[in-house]
Amino acid sequence: MSDKSDLKAELERKKQRLAQIREEKKRKEEERKKKEADMQQKKEPVPDDSDLDRKRRETEALLQSIGISPEPPLVPTPMSPSSKSVSTPSEAGSQDSGDLGPLTRRRLHKLGVSKITQVDFLPREVVSYSKETQTPLATHQSEEDEDDEEMVEPKGDQDSEQENEDKKQEVKEAPPRELTEEEKQQILHSEEFLIFFDRTIRVIERALAEDSDIFFDYSGRELEEKDGDVQAGANLSFNRQFYDEHWSKHRVVTCMDWSLQYPELMVASYNNNEDAPHEPDGVALVWNMKFKKTTPEYVFHCQSSVMSVCFARFHPNLVVGGTYSGQIVLWDNRSHRRTPVQRTPLSAAAHTHPVYCVNVVGTQNAHNLITVSTDGKMCSWSLDMLSTPQESMELVYNKSKPVAVTGMAFPTGDVNNFVVGSEEGTVYTACRHGSKAGIGEVFEGHQGPVTGINCHMAVGPIDFSHLFVTSSFDWTVKLWTTKHNKPLYSFEDNADYVYDVMWSPVHPALFACVDGMGRLDLWNLNNDTEVPTASVAIEGASALNRVRWAQGGKEVAVGDSEGRIWIYDVGELAVPHNDEWTRFARTLVEIRANRADSEEEGAVELSA
């Protein structure tokens, strides 16, 4: 109601102002006419009243007495002093009444217009503010003033034009009305504003957090004159870092894994923090790539350093960890506890040495947890019961030498055969079941402990599942095939320990490796086998311990010795073209041919 009263009062003040302007103009016009009459009287001699003038005045007085106003002359006739003095009282009265006639009628018209204006304004105010629509006040004033001017009897064309110009000038100069605090609060708490703000802030937040190149051309026109793969390698860019000041500080990243059910989730395991002896020795943190939050999604811990970790492939809520004490622990994110919901016993039936290898293999209806410890013991578990292993086997070479396993990998689609790397630098093939269960072939080539091993994962028109790569303390990465016990190729571009290696899950010729100098290398064997296709060194040059590709192959995660996890976007380098499989097959043929030539040259030198 206060807004309506203010608007009504404002309109009344505008009307009064217009009336004052009209009165002022009228007064000035009368003064001007009076001055002109005085000037003319001074210039011209006073003529004697003629008989015609006297009769005209009598006639005009008679007409005015009966209510008829005579037509005013176009040019005002100067009046002599004698005529003023001779005029009778009746004439003076009739003249006064004649002069006041138009003014009286104009005032009556103004009263009528004011009443009509009150009737017109109220509905417009209600309609305008019932919709809570903010409109400029000057617009209403302009419309109403125009209506007012149309209803008032016009004084003349010249006066109307002047008044319209004055009104337009006032409208232009009038500043927008400032909203009161009450009106602002009403808008801020209105349902429409809250819905709009809630929807818009989500869009703006996503736009501010988006780091990808929105101008990328998927048609590839920008790469037509360049080597597409090499150019895409430049897209290896830093995405984000996972680090928690409390749980990650002074800990080493020992293992990482991505969730199959939720591709944005990754779990990382950490060893003990020597500066915090009262904190749990083992920690596993679940990080979320989807949101730009800096804290882990879940925090799990146990009393022994976690050396290996993985998501239970067919159980999206379970996380499996292998500890330095030999225990296998199981965490459940549905539980409110951060400690394991299940764990294996510390007994001779299970592991009693550090477990560096945990892996869930099988199908949805038939799967097992496979674990291997550094004493060469392999156990098969059911995730429903970790009190005792379903199967156990000693990995022994020549029936006397236990294999100190440091890494394990299963070929794609195989749950029986696998390969393991050992502390002495030897790689073995092994089998879980059958007449040849246990250690099979021996692959010698590394001069130091094997730190990482991974089988070819990309599925395509040509089967490369027999290939695997290994990394070692001897500063090299080697390419192997299960069909031959000698390495196919040795990549020797690193100048420090190579701690881990992994094939791309989508590109047949691409793998990543990390070393002790904090360098991440991406090798595309279809481009070059001598130098990496793309490389990046992390800030601080901390040693990189682990590397893991995301399921889609677009991102690669690396963990360092300071507890930090670095996520890098690989870009178009990770996207395979249709001919990548055939090109890689030709590359392997060339590698085998070069290896055969080298062996022949070596044999010739030995014979000589």
Curated annotation (Swiss-Prot):
Residues 80-90 have a biased composition (Low complexity). Residues 1-13, 20-60, 165-184 have a biased composition (Basic and acidic residues). It holds the Pfam family WD40. The modification N-acetylserine is found at S2. GO terms for biological process: transport along microtubule. The modification Phosphoserine is found at S50, S83, S90, S94, S97, S142, S160, S598. Gene3D superfamilies: YVTN repeat-like/Quinoprotein amine dehydrogenase. Residues 110-126 are annotated as: Interaction with DYNLT1. SMART domains: WD40. Residues 70-79 have a biased composition (Pro residues). It comes from the Eukaryota. Its main location: cytoplasm. Residues 1-106, 132-184 are annotated as: Disordered. PROSITE patterns: WD_REPEATS_REGION. GO terms for cellular component: cytoplasm; cytoplasmic dynein complex; kinetochore; microtubule; spindle pole; vesicle. Keywords: Acetylation, Centromere, Chromosome, Cytoplasm, Cytoskeleton, Dynein, Kinetochore, Microtubule, Motor protein, Phosphoprotein, Repeat, Transport, WD repeat. InterPro entries: DYNC1I1/DYNC1I2, Dynein_IC, WD40/YVTN_repeat-like_dom_sf, WD40_repeat_dom_sf, WD40_rpt. One of its GO terms (molecular function) is dynein heavy chain binding. The modification Phosphothreonine is found at T88, T139. Transmembrane segments: none annotated. Acts as one of several non-catalytic accessory components of the cytoplasmic dynein 1 complex that are thought to be involved in linking dynein to cargos and to adapter proteins that regulate dynein function. Cytoplasmic dynein 1 acts as a motor for the intracellular retrograde motility of vesicles and organelles along microtubules. The intermediate chains mediate the binding of dynein to dynactin via its 150 kDa component (p150-glued) DCTN1. May play a role in mediating the interaction of cytoplasmic dynein with membranous organelles and kinetochores. Belongs to the dynein intermediate chain family. This is Cytoplasmic dynein 1 intermediate chain 1. It comes from Bos taurus.
